């Protein structure tokens, strides 16, 4: 049985860690240090660290398995990992780039779990990128880690069909379960020496960058279909939001529809409200707002929102 060293940080990596721990031999786990959460600034362990503690307490992980939460990957860390005699690295969203010194510690290779169908959507935000682009399918790729990010040879892929209603949070949860199955299959291939790596077609590569809070500000000159995709792609973060009379309004759910309102109003204009929502003019088509949230308040469906704050959904939004 190969000796696996696992690296990951967020919740999406937990199913893969759990599967590897149950079916293979995990000698060590690497994750980011505890981070401050909430207004209190309380330090909280990563989702992967919390799962490590659960698996060890339940006896799934052996007592000899080590948890690493270094602030930086230095020589002392490399020496400690080397002492575990790992065969293979499995990495899912650890959050930092590994250098050649670290990758050389794994004689059977370093494997990355990437939630897209590489070479499409190389980069740090492949799930929201697929939603923003209106892709009909996405998936999970396992590939060798190389010098160029997400460009290594492909070991396995699993495809997932999209129906156009997915949010980033829900889709990433779904892909995390697909990834766990794929990781198990690939590690079996490592043990049996049956893997057949395939080079990526680099000419077909597309790329995605980091999200930032400012991206969540609704640009009403965008087409309605783009704004609807942004709502789903930016859930849970940074969300899509607008302003009215200086107050921030988060748009949690909406539907794009063709305009039946004439004449064409300035973008951001609230056109009407009926049983199908609150209709806002966009650069192309109309966006029907279905669920909204004022700052510091609970989410409300549009009827309840109008009952409590009718003046916030009049005139033009975002001005």
UniProtKB/Swiss-Prot annotation:
InterPro entries: Fmt, Formyl_trans_C, Formyl_trans_C_sf, Formyl_transf_N, Formyl_transf_N_sf, Formyl_transferase-like_C_sf, Met-tRNA-FMT_C, Met-tRNA-FMT_N. GO terms for molecular function: methionyl-tRNA formyltransferase activity. GO terms for cellular component: cytosol. (6S)-5,6,7,8-tetrahydrofolate binds at residues 116-119. Its EC number is 2.1.2.9. Belongs to the Fmt family. It comes from the Bacteria. HAMAP family: Formyl_trans. Gene3D superfamilies: Formyl transferase, C-terminal domain (3.10.25.10), Formyl transferase, N-terminal domain (3.40.50.170). Transmembrane segments: none annotated. Attaches a formyl group to the free amino group of methionyl-tRNA(fMet). The formyl group appears to play a dual role in the initiator identity of N-formylmethionyl-tRNA by promoting its recognition by IF2 and preventing the misappropriation of this tRNA by the elongation apparatus. It comes from Treponema pallidum (strain Nichols). Keywords: Protein biosynthesis, Transferase. This is Methionyl-tRNA formyltransferase. CDD domains: FMT_core_Met-tRNA-FMT_N, Met_tRNA_FMT_C.
């Amino acid at each position: 049985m190969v000796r696996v060293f696992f690296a990951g940080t967020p919740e999406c990596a937990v199913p893969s860690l759990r599967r590897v721990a149950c079916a293979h031999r995990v000698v060590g786990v690497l994750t980011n240090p505890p981070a401050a959460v909430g207004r209190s600034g309380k330090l909280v362990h990563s989702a992967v660290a919390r799962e490590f503690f659960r698996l060890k307490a339940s006896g799934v992980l052996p007592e000899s398995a080590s948890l690493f939460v270094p602030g930086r990957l230095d020589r002392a860390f490399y020496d400690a990992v080397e002492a575990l005699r790992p065969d293979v690295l499995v990495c899912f969203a650890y959050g930092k780039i590994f250098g050649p010194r670290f990758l050389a510690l794994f004689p059977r290779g370093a494997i990355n779990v990437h939630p897209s169908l590489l070479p499409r959507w190389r980069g740090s935000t492949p799930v929201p990128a697929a939603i923003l682009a209106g892709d009909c399918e996405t998936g999970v790729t396992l590939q060798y880690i190389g010098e160029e990010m997400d460009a290594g040879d492909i070991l396995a892929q699993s495809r997932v069909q999209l129906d156009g209603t997915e949010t980033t949070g829900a889709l990433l949860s779904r892909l995390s379960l697909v990834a766990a199955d794929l990781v198990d299959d690939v590690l079996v291939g490592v043990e049996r020496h049956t893997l057949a790596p395939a080079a990526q077609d680099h000419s077909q590569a597309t790329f995605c960058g980091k999200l930032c809070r400012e991206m969540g500000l609704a640009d009403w000159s965008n087409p309605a279909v783009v704004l609807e995709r942004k709502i789903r792609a930016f859930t849970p973060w940074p969300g899509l939001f607008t302003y009215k009379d200086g107050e921030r309004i988060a748009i949690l759910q909406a539907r794009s529809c063709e305009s039946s309102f004439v004449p064409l109003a300035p973008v951001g204009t609230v056109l009407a409200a009926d049983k199908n929502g609150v209709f806002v003019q966009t650069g192309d088509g109309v966006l029907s707002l279905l669920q909204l949230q004022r700052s510091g308040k609970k989410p409300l469906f549009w009827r309840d929102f109008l009952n409590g704050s009718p003046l916030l959904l009049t005139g033009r939004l975002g001005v």
